[in-house]
């Protein structure tokens, strides 16, 4: 008995049989395919973040369920995209129990919550690696990545780029 393998995954459809002494083209001896229309779905298949059950007889993994209803899931969406229902906007949801926290929201800075799931410090708005001096950091202007303690400071530009508090127009330090 031979079983048709429409999706070419090496697992045959138990409902597509053929009796033959030799193996017909497109048929195999295995009859364990649970979805012969998808080559990513077969017994013990690796689970993909695609919104579909890939492992035959299993259930949708928890990281592919949108528990908070924000249209984001925890896993990183597979390269083939999201195929399940409901439609999902993206993956990498860092808090799947709070709809206000996901990669699609605008970050609210300085509240101590990584609202956009970027993984960075909530106290480093300009992304220069230095937290704001208003939040125990050393960055005196957290809206400009070129301004932080230790940055090179160009004289006479009116900007305290290195956060030392010195007069930008007094290079020789004589007070004038």
Stretches found by the model and what they are:
Residues 1-176:
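Membrane-associated feature with strongest affinity for ZDHHC
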